[in-house]
């Protein structure tokens, strides 16, 4: 019985040691990327209020397949090569970027790229078009 307890204890110690050794997966740990430019995140409610306001640009950064399922009325499909030409001339114009949902990062990437060009009033709506449609808000299909 004591032999079994010793073997179990030794196995437990080896497992705990292995977990500690393998925690870094054999590579050096690197710090997470810190971005200097981050858009302000808005809720669906804020997005809806801005949409009703009317003088706000909405940019859909989804794939063509997701865009074809539906988009926010008046939103511009942004996932194109000539996206810079779609931007307003006024660098202070209010713009909302969205993609599919909170798991999609395309709208954050697009918003940061726009901010690099000097645009100052850039917003991102993390809930995206899926959140918009699931909450019963109006949408259009092409």
Question: Where in the sequence are the language-model features?
Answer:
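Short, glycine/acidic-enriched loop or turn micro-motifs at the edges of active sites
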Residues: 63, 82
């Amino acid at each position: 019985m004591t032999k079994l307890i010793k073997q179990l204890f030794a196995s437990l110690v080896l497992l705990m040691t292995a977990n500690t050794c393998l925690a870094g997966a054999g590579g050096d740990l690197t710090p997470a990327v810190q971005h200097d430019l981050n858009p302000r995140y808005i809720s669906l409610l804020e997005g809806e209020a801005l949409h009703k306001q009317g003088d706000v640009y909405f940019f859909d950064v989804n794939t063509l397949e997701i865009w074809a399922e539906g988009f926010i009325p008046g939103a511009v499909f942004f996932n194109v090569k000539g996206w810079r030409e779609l931007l307003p001339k006024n660098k202070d114009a209010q713009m909302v970027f969205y993609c599919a949902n909170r798991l999609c990062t395309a709208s954050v990437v697009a918003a940061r790229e726009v901010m690099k060009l000097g645009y100052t009033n850039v917003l991102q709506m993390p809930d995206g078009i899926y959140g918009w449609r699931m909450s019963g808000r109006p949408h259009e299909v092409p």
